[in-house]
Amino acid sequence: MSMTERVRKLRQASLDAEETLSSERAELLTAFYWQEPGPVSAPVRRALAFRYLLEHKAISIGEGELIVGEKGPAPKNAPTYPELCCHSLEDLDLLNSREKISFKVSPETRQVYEQTIIPFWQGKSLRDLLFREMTDEWQAAYEAGIFTEFMEQRAPGHTVLDDKIYHRGMLDFIAEIETRLEALDFLHDLGAYSKQEELRAMRIAAEAIVGFSERYAEEARQQAKKVADPKRRSELKQIAEVCSQVPAHAPRNFWEALQAYWFVHLGVTIELNTWDSFCPGHLDRHLTPFYRQGLEEGTLNREQAEELLQCFWIKFNNQPAPPKVGVTAAESGTYTDFAQINLGGILEDGSDGVSEVTYLLLDVIEEMRLLQPSSSIQVSKKNPDRFIQRAARIIRTGFGQPSAFNADLIVQELVRMGKTMEDARSGGSSGCVEVGAFGKEAYILTGYFNLPKVLEITLHNGRDPRSGKQIGLETGDPTGFQSFEELFAAFEKQLLYFLDIKVRGNQVIERLYATFMPAPFLSLLINDCIARGRDYHDGGARYNSSYVQGVGLGSITDILTALNYHIYDRKSMTMAQMLSMIEVDFVGFERERQKLLNKTPKYGNDDDYADGIMRRVFEAYFNALDGRKNTRGGEYRINLLPTTCHIYFGSVTGATPDGRKAWTPLSEGISPVQGADRHGPTAVLQSASKMDHARTGGTLLNQKFTPQLLADDAGLEGLVQLIRTYFILDGHHIQFNVVDVATLRLAQKHPEEYRDLIVRVAGYSDYFCDLSEALQNEIIARTEHGTF
């Protein structure tokens, strides 16, 4: 089935809509806090604010819509969250005027900010408090580009829904909360009062989302009275019935299941601007019972289900990521908000998770060709090749979706972190490549960590050469190091020092969110927040992980390899000579630079010399971070991914001993340095598989193929076997760009002719013409493979 006329119109309207900054949420929230509900606890205050938002925000049902609800007043209207980050007038002007990832800011919106929102929130936002609480050491490292902080402009909440909302309605949650409240023991439980307030807040939040859906039901009823077309009148009456049923009660059919999720998604992302966006998780397995039931009863056919899913897809595409500025915009410069749908994998009993709904969803992904939602295939040894082949046919269209994950390895990763086997099998990937136990875990991404920058500071005895400031430890003049072991030991000391600073900061930030910014609606959706009477931000979830995302693994590997190979092994140059060359960005030393680029072992070529150093960096990073306790009762873990932060981190890192020029991008994910992999994709997979992916919470590997390679069935089968091979080698994730360099260069020169060109950036797809020039050039520079 292709798109119906309804879907074509809705899809085009979504694509044509302009990303606009909406002041609606900020105005309503400010009005609520002006009123101040009296002496109530922080969780209850946040729940009352949530209720106020849902009672007063504008609602609308667009022409032809079957799935209803928007975060803002209209599609592509992005709300703001001044309690977290209050944008200045300068921020608004920048958002309105910048060339890429801009948001239209109307004069009326700017005036509201100037007269109402900024005067109330300036100095009071959590971002203001966060920066006030950070140490001088943290500030220096942050400003130098050692790390970023995810929670300075967006809330934690990187989590995924399980199947509970498909079996239970909000009234069931409220009944459970009432039971927990009645059972509180104030005589013997010293935390009873805190639990009471959190449970009361969850109850208010659950009631609020029911009221919100009823507003939509009433809107549909009113529209039905006015519309002349009998078919649309019937649809609106059905929408009213759906919205009266869910999410108050459990969904009874396929349509209600989709609408139930969408109301929950809106609730989570209206409450706070969770990073990454809330995700549906294993949508195929959640929808399969409703699909089969509809077919058996004769109330649903495949075409109807497909149209509903297509309408569902459009709702995701209508929601741009919240406006970002500063470092946060640099580390994640995209409209995409990373809501990922998992397909396939294995069920909780360990059996094959592929169903007829899996293939239906793959058809929808190919037909819709939208950036959001993101999609992934979860590949298990138990899945049929037909499943991967179907996904491969989509990949070869050059859409960048779906990405591929090793479902069997993800289970190992989660079990290693302490999850039960059942919870691990119900987990998967979200955001870019991060893993968690769906519906049961708060796995917070804390920010990116610049591995090559730490080495750069090591090579300057703790000084940042960009600013001239001493921000690290004095680990010794590297010209005096007699061996690679001395150099690596100095790097490990700096690495531990900066990770200590990063973790200390995040311990404080976690408490700030737990204390001042509870999330009662998100909390009631995640086990075991109700049972514990604790907020999602305060360790209420069954599992609570904190991730730090390492960036530039390929770059730091090649840098250390060059130092070891040329200075300590071959002795073809001295450390002093190397430092002199990078200090002047290789000006006057192009011959030596070409030697570093072309006559040095490189990661990504199945070369044990370079790959062995990669393993040492991996082990150093893992040992310095993994297993540290966070404040929520969980532990810190590593993962390796960049979003767009390898561009930002490169812009603050000078020339490096691998031949890289100053201020240019670092390598992305666990991919080799751009252009350094010269022995084909199989060699890349061999190199990447030499790290222990099972000890991470996610690794990201990009590959770029020519369209000609995948043009026939033999090419498709080669891609299927490449994915299978990498996962046999225990790789975590792989994704593909299928586009040639010539097309990308033409798109740079004539963007108006290539507005629909989509590429895979990091853990997401984006329009090539929406990317910064630096990011466009980085994607062009990635090695293009014409053979397997």
What are these model-predicted stretches?
Residues Q223-R232:
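A conserved hydrophobic secondary-structure block that centers on an alpha-helix together
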Residues S213-A220:
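Secondary-structure-rich domain cores
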